[in-house]
């Protein structure tokens, strides 16, 4: 696939590695990757979308080829939202776009999808396995009061979040992950042995831990009421071993124009079932265009 690459400077002087794919005259999709991935994780999905869309991807700070901030607070959600703004202002200035995000890419993209300044520019948001931390905090409080089994079920899926708060633990563990070792972990989760390898996995895992440390405790202890400023689609992965599908149940409270689609897949469906994920992205975007045209 033909692609071009760019360097974009952020508001705090970090450098983000950005790629664009396809015909610039097509509608724009911005894809944001999760943890411990980099933008290459989207390439299987891009292959099914590039004929119809102009696609923008980037390595989030601390991942792939992008620079690595020295302090944890540089990974806070407001700054990550500014990173997205820097990317779109540089690569697609003054153009509107559809946002699609997975895992931590989705968590950080909720910050933008609930930010009023994007109202005239962000056309839609497709979230995959990454809830808004503020919404999740309200949901967990409600579950603890009224549905404790559901609360503890999600806690068992989120054990790693507590582990990532321990200084030096996660960065040390990631040093032992080779691309092949991580590939075997993904293969067991997704039931496929032909998944592409992440050759940056040790660094991506080590540095990306700061996403958890900078955001989970502040957001879970002091959640904010944040409402979506555009139509939202949640692609719910029914076999997801890290994010409970029940977290999506409350999402209509926060998104006036909301739809949900279930996919029988595990957490990294963008790798194991890229055609299915691409189909749902395309369907949602096309439906938006039909509604807008009418």
Residue ranges and their predicted role:
Residues 12-14, 25-26:
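Short acidic/polar mixed-charge low-complexity motifs
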Residues 21, 235, 262-265:
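Conserved beta-strand termini and adjacent loop/short-helix elements that scaffold enzyme active sites
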Residues 2, 14-16, 35, 41, ...:
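Flexible "cap/lid" subdomain of the alpha/beta-hydrolase fold that forms the substrate-access gate
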Residues 256-294:
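Catalytic active-site module of serine/aspartate enzymes centered on a nucleophile-bearing elbow/loop
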Residues 19-65:
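Conserved HGGG/HGGXW glycine-rich cap/lid loop of the alpha/beta-hydrolase fold
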Residues 7, 17, 28, 211:
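Conserved beta-strand positions that form and line the central face of beta-propeller blades
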Residues 23-24, 91-95, 288:
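Glycine-rich phosphate-binding loop signature in dinucleotide/nucleotide-binding domains
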Residues 1-7:
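An N-terminal hydrophobic leader/cap segment in hydrolases
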